[in-house]
């Protein structure tokens, strides 16, 4: 919702994230990003990581978690996983969404199973490699 207001909206979003963090709240950026590798890497750093400019590091929006769309494949998700590992952050990866038309693609049967089940298995694979004490950060 913030993005519809352009730069002032993004500034308000950053202020909202910072305010929530000042209250020790966990911030989930419901950004649903998913793109080719290099663009996903930029999104991942911008939302969850730090960017190096000269000798100084700057945080972007600095959410604790972000939502990611995996439907472009692993090269669109792996940059987020790498940043999460470096920054001790987490992801919620879309598998089956609740919007009315989600079934147009997500419910398609592939080898006897809906696509979202295949996606869920892949997300579980990614998560298995990144377990914390009790759960995966993916």
What annotation goes with each model-predicted range?
Residues 35-138:
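Conserved anion-binding
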Residues 1-59:
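N-terminal active-site wall of soluble small-molecule enzyme domains
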């Amino acid at each position: 919702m913030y993005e519809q207001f352009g730069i002032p909206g993004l500034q308000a979003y950053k202020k909202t994230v910072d305010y929530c963090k000042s209250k020790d709240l966990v911030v989930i950026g419901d950004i649903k990003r998913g793109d080719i590798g290099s663009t996903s890497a930029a999104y991942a750093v911008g939302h969850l990581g730090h960017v190096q400019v000269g000798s100084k590091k700057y945080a972007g929006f600095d959410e604790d978690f972000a939502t990611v769309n995996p439907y472009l494949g692993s090269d669109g998700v792996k940059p987020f996983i790498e940043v999460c590992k470096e920054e001790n952050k987490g992801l919620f990866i879309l598998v089956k969404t609740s919007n009315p038309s989600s079934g147009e693609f997500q419910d398609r049967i592939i080898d006897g199973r809906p696509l979202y089940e295949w996606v869920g298995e892949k997300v579980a694979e990614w998560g298995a490699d990144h377990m914390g004490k009790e759960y995966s950060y993916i």
